[in-house]
Amino acid sequence: MSKSIEKFPKELVSPIAQLHSLVEKNSKLHIKELFAAEQDRFQNYSVKFDQLVFDYSKHRITKSVLEQLFALAKTKQLTHWIERLFSQDKVNCTEQRAAMHWALRLPSEYSKFPELTKQVHNQLQRMYALVEKIHAGQYRGATGEVIQDVVNIGVGGSDLGPQMVTHALCDFKVKTAKPLNVHFVSTMDGSQLSDLLHQLRPETTLFIISSKSFGTIDTLSNAQTVRQWLEKALGKHDRVVKSHFIGVSTKAEKMTEWGIAPDNQLLLWDWVGGRYSLWSCIGFPIALTIGIDGFQQLLAGAHAVDEHFQNTGFEQNIPVLMALLGIWNNNFLNIQTHAVLPYDGRLKYFAAYLQQLEMESNGKSVQRDGQKVELDTCPIVWGEVGPNAQHAFYQLLHQGTQAVSCDFIAPIQRYNADHFTYVENAEALIEQHHLALSNCLAQSRLLAFGNEALDSAELKNLPIYKQYEGNQPSSTLLLKELNPYSLGMLIALYEHKVFVQSVIWNINPFDQWGVEKGKQIADQLLPILNGAQNDLSTLDASTRGLIKILLGKVDG
């Protein structure tokens, strides 16, 4: 390919062809050689923005590669697509909807979309009023007791985002009139819920039914179980449901039909995708945990990234760089798995959140025009809190046969903020934070440089099974500290990274048709398992055999 390219002027060759040529040309290039050739490589391949530092110098890229990645973005009309996203255009082409999660974090004084901003803030104010009432101990259950436990019942975007943020910002939990605990339930099998209900008192427990469609069977089956639990303890009175349930949905009529009082119904819109919805009233558990000011800081951090994404050239645009590095690794270096490694235990659920954000958005094989994709799309996204991962799967990263790209994430400061709870242990905990940071830097260094990172004397007689090849690419994202504002920034960076990659691949990141059919097939099988139907003739042999075992008709 590279020989044929040389026959034509550079500007006439497509960026994709040029990138393939660069892969061939630099196929044996090692990250350590890139650093040896550029003494100021860190300065050239890092971006500082607000409370963030993004270092991408440990990727297998050169200036020529970056130039062609930017050219690829231009040929895909990325700037135009960013403008379309931040309008009310129906960029979700299969469902004929806009994708306006960015509108959920617009400041109240934002003048470009006055009606949209007013709509959003009306619902946020209703949510804030409920938060204040619960925090003050003024919201009472059916027996008049103060609410002390709130259980969020949701799944997917109604669970992963709120749970991730609530856990990540545990240091910022606000004081309330009476201690308030927030819990999350998502699994449809009932085990999670069963374990939790044993710990709760019906009189002091409030449930949030969080479902965009108010038709998700996972969520409604859990909601029905807790309704029975409440009514068994408190009686079958209208006031039980009206006092102990809050609904968050696009479907006011369905919430009313279920029995939720109008004052306890928080609304969102069909232009908010579930996995992009934590900024809306789906984020009610977040606001209950970190308070109204904290929630507003979360929104402000995301809005700052929205502005950065729209108004910054590609060369300094962090979401664009994150996306294009992913394209380079996935589509040209054939690195089809990506690990997310936060070095902070508070980000325990961040990788799981990103799995949905990235793989449900970009796990597609059909382009916007209905044709099969021309490039591989989303890689497998996985990860774990870094120090734990070191004792689980870093062996594979360092000495396995799989090429893996990584994101290392860490806060620069901890245990020195006003919200720090354990002042008496501050010195020891600061040392522990430094221990985590040193491991974060050491692991990214060893992955990149391999044996080069070792002491030369140590390397001299080192057996091959103790050696490291290196050349595994990674980015490092440093936050000044992990707080509501910086977490809002971090999440929005990944949201926009996903969008940029969808533009390059020409796919719709805002639908999830692959999820729908499995639910429909489950609806067809449920009557068989419940004994209401017994015709198995249309099923495949495997499913028939498994159903017979489940029904006890044959031995397992």
From Swiss-Prot:
Pathway per the UniProt entry: Carbohydrate biosynthesis; gluconeogenesis; Carbohydrate degradation; glycolysis; D-glyceraldehyde 3-phosphate and glycerone phosphate from D-glucose: step 2/4
Record carries keyword Transferase: no
GO CC field: cytosol
Active site: E360, H391, K519
GO biological process, one term: glucose 6-phosphate metabolic process
Domain of life: Bacteria
Catalyzed reactions: alpha-D-glucose 6-phosphate = beta-D-fructose 6-phosphate
Gene Ontology molecular function, alphabetical: carbohydrate derivative binding; glucose-6-phosphate isomerase activity; monosaccharide binding
EC annotation from Swiss-Prot or TrEMBL: 5.3.1.9
Leading EC class: isomerase
Cellular localization per UniProt: Cytoplasm
NCBIfam families named in the record: PRK00179.1 (NF001211)
PANTHER family (alphabetical): GLUCOSE-6-PHOSPHATE ISOMERASE
Function: Catalyzes the reversible isomerization of glucose-6-phosphate to fructose-6-phosphate.
The protein, known as: Glucose-6-phosphate isomerase
Organism: Acinetobacter baumannii (strain ACICU)
Lineage: Bacteria, Pseudomonadati, Pseudomonadota, Gammaproteobacteria, Moraxellales
